[in-house]
């Protein structure tokens, strides 16, 4: 591992990386930039926070991801739908949304009611699993979880996840109707995102305290739906011999248990290049291409 060379690459190329951390065998061994002082947009890495909250909530409410998502969504909104829409969404389990395997959903909800927008999308073949990455799926899971809990999901996350992890610098977004927006909009420090990664690396424990069930972590980090990138779990991505938390513009937390590594960085690089990833793999993972 040559972390200094990775940092030199970042600086020399002018990559807008806010900060980076590397953990080996649960210990912070390298850091660069702003890792603890300021929060930064993590975009779709927000979905990973929602994913772990799904399991945490099982301590307080029976939340069965194999039930139709309509079982948990507001009944008045479901009853107001045309019969065909009710039948269609009634065939879609929470698990299908967790694994991004519902076709036809556009990328993001729009309008004054994200919920009505989402529930009125025409799903042509609800029984066919197809990878369709979008924000609506995560939004609906968040609404379903909030309704099942009967409480504000953002506040619940603060109490049940962030407090045990020692996360106290954060921001998150809401939809126009006030529901926690589980798809994007969260801000964390680099170190705070690493803590979420460490929770998953430890198969659900943090500093000796069990927060998630080991079974859920195994399911969430395993391939549940195949895609071009190698597979998708419960709002988590397969990455080499491990998995990753991803957000646009290169927000990353790579969790590699077999290598005993966690690599986290937050940045703002608005392009589709793999230069930063290639540099990380070369100097941190020792992968030559």
Summary of predicted features, one role per range:
Residues 26, 41-66, 141-145, 196:
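Active-site SXXK
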Residues 29-36, 104-186:
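Catalytic-site signature segments of enzymes, centered on catalytic residues
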Residues 140-144, 184-205, 251-267:
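Active-site-proximal alpha-helical segments within enzyme catalytic domains
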Residues 3-36, 65, 253-256, 260-264:
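A short, well-structured edge-of-sheet supersecondary motif
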Residues 55, 70, 95-99, 142-146, ...:
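Non-transmembrane alpha-helical segments in soluble domains
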């Amino acid at each position: 591992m040559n972390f200094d060379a990775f940092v030199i690459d970042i600086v020399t190329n002018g990559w807008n990386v806010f900060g980076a951390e590397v953990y080996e065998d649960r210990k912070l061994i390298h850091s660069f930039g702003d890792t603890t002082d300021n929060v930064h947009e993590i975009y779709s890495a927000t979905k990973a926070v929602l994913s772990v909250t799904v399991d945490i909530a099982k301590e307080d409410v029976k939340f069965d991801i194999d039930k139709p998502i309509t079982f948990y969504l507001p009944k008045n909104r479901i009853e107001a739908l045309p019969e065909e829409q009710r039948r269609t969404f009634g065939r879609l389990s929470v698990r299908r949304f967790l694994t991004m395997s519902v076709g036809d959903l556009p990328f993001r909800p729009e309008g004054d009611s994200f919920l009505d927008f989402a529930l009125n999308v025409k799903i042509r073949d609800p029984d066919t699993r197809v990878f369709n990455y979008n924000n609506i799926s995560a939004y609906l899971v968040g609404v379903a979880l909030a309704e099942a809990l009967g409480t504000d999901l953002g506040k619940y996350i603060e109490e049940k996840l962030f407090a045990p992890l020692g996360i106290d610098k954060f921001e998150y977004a809401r939809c126009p109707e006030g529901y926690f927006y589980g798809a994007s909009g969260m801000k964390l420090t680099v170190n705070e995102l690493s803590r979420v990664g460490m929770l998953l690396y430890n198969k659900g424990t943090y500093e000796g305290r069990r927060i998630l069930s080991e079974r859920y972590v195994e399911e969430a980090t395993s391939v549940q739906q195949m895609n071009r990138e190698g597979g998708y779990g419960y709002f988590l991505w397969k990455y080499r011999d491990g998995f990753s938390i991803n957000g646009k513009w290169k927000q990353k937390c790579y969790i590699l248990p077999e290598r005993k590594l966690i690599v986290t960085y937050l940045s703002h690089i608005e392009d589709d290049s793999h230069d930063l990833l290639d540099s990380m793999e070369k100097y941190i993972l020792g992968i030559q291409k």
